[in-house]
């Protein structure tokens, strides 16, 4: 569910590995392009030939009708946007809206895998409650199984990242993790790293991105200082790289894109729910 910049290559990878795959998206124009065998990601190399093959062979189709598509599925991937609102609070509306739809559509023990980046604990609380429903009409572990496998790929290098980067897997029920691992190993042929639960897997994904955000902010501050001191920033960084445990970051306009700026606020949102004194350095880096 969700066939955007990262999600469509994911769907193509599943279809190319032999699975009959249905891409579900509210963007009807995108759905029409896919079903018309018109590849929508012109600037993403490596997937165009796969796209042509799997669409022609009937392995990949697209629809905006979630009610018709889901009963046909054994495994459901959620790869939906998790942006910020105007108050810099993570907006999980897309995931929660789909979660409510799943409540009326699941019943056969399907596995639901969340690839979207979310704050630790969101899966086990808000999303799980949403899928089970207020009246607990569905039961996790009986009517469906919930797991996570956070996506890890950079636009423009998605195929290369899919083929080399290990993936994390966590689940509400421990017994589901090996099943998800086997599925992703079959599709991507990469290492799957089991996590003890969903929130740990989500924390790892956030930590890798927020680490970059903080260090980029730090080096930008240093660059401003060095300019006043008459020191060349790049000379300092290149010389500092001689030490094996120094991880080089370079000054620039700051982080951008749909992920890194949001990820820091996801951690900050988590922190505020517990104790606002946590993660001051993350707030300063923003």
Where are these regions (language model features)?
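Structural/interface elements that position substrates and couple domains in central-metabolism enzymes
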Residues: 1-286
């Amino acid at each position: 569910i969700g066939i955007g910049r990262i999600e469509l290559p994911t769907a193509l990878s599943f279809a190319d590995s032999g699975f009959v795959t249905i891409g579900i998206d509210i963007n009807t124009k995108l759905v029409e392009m896919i079903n018309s065998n018109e590849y929508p990601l012109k600037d993403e190399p490596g997937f165009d030939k796969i796209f042509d093959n799997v669409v022609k062979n009937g392995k990949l189709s697209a629809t905006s009708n979630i009610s018709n598509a889901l009963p046909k599925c054994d495994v459901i991937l959620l790869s939906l946007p998790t942006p910020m609102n105007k108050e810099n609070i993570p907006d999980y509306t897309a995931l929660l809206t789909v979660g409510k739809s799943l409540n009326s559509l699941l019943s056969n023990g399907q596995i639901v895998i969340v690839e979207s980046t979310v704050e630790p604990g969101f899966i086990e609380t808000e999303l799980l409650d949403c899928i089970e429903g207020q009246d607990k009409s569905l039961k996790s572990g009986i009517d469906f199984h919930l797991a996570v496998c956070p996506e890890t790929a950079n636009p423009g290098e998605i195929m290369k990242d899919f083929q080399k980067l290990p993936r994390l897997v966590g689940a509400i029920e421990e017994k589901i993790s090996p099943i998800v691992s086997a599925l992703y190993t079959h599709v991507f042929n990469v290492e799957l790293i089991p996590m003890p639960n969903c929130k740990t897997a989500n924390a790892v994904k956030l930590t890798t991105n927020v680490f970059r955000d903080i260090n980029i902010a730090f080096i930008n501050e240093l660059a401003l200082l060095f300019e006043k001191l008459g020191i060349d920033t790049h000379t300092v960084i290149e010389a500092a790289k001689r030490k094996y445990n120094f991880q080089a970051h370079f000054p620039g306009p700051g982080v951008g894109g749909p992920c890194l700026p949001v990820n820091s606020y996801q951690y900050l949102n988590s922190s505020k729910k517990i104790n606002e004194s946590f993660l001051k350095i993350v707030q300063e880096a923003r």
